[in-house]
């Protein structure tokens, strides 16, 4: 007794056993076992319900049979009573037909029960199959789906790497192909140039004396033409500058004449009306400088015919190379003459730019009359300057300057 008490004390001291953690595989197996047990329990419950229904149906059938027997007895009793009362007698055949109908009804009921049982068994089988499929898909969802997802991601990564490698290889092949094409074209051009050089060298070796001189003369003419064109350009630029200066000077002359048409009162009284100026008044004072009057004036428009005449005068300067030199000298002389007359004496006749006889014409113009002026060009003789052209003998073929080079031949190709 004491030992049993000690053992009970030890059990009480130890307390409830501690739960041991199982590995994942055993935990999955336990989980599946629990699922199976739950399914079996559900099936057992369904079977139990079906058995109860079957028992109820059997009880109902037995009750119906008892009721049938009671009804038959009741009918027989009624028949016997009716028979006793003189009613028509029910024969054996009628009873057999009624019994046959009743048995037929019972057989139909039993057949229906068998069909119902077959349907229930088939439904149970389908239910078990669907339950197994459900368990399989649940297991796949918990375990297999993760593994398959990892496989899918790894395969997608492999496909992406393969695509990237293919793109890189295609780009590399394109670059190499372009480099190869460039090298081939470069080598072909170099070979063509070399062959052209060799062909020209061979042609130079086999040239006769007449064609040799013609080639050399052609090269010399090209150089002379280049020099001539350069000189022509320089002369054209100089002519354009001189034309611009000429137009500026003509504009200044027009402005000076229009200003001088404004005649003062003292000059009008003494020269046009023939009156004497009173001694009290001061004599006419001329402006100190002609340049200051020009700076105070406003520019006045010149008619189109004057500009056309000046353009005609300038158009005569565009001539050949030798004539342009003489025109340049002629324009320079005109410029010097204009500058001399512009800064000459400041006399009264110079201010009017006319003689005293023509002074009345200015007076008759009226206060608002303006004399329109024009410029006319005049052809002048051109003196040609003979240039001494150095005479070169083309027969001296042995000199180093008269040799035909590859560049000279290449210019003809």
Curated annotation (Swiss-Prot):
Residues 1-22 are annotated as: Disordered. The keyword Transmembrane helix does not apply. Residues 8-21 have a biased composition (Basic and acidic residues). Residues 36-186, 216-255 form a coiled coil. The keyword Coiled coil applies. It comes from the Eukaryota. Keywords: Coiled coil. This is Coiled-coil domain-containing protein 83. The gene is CCDC83.
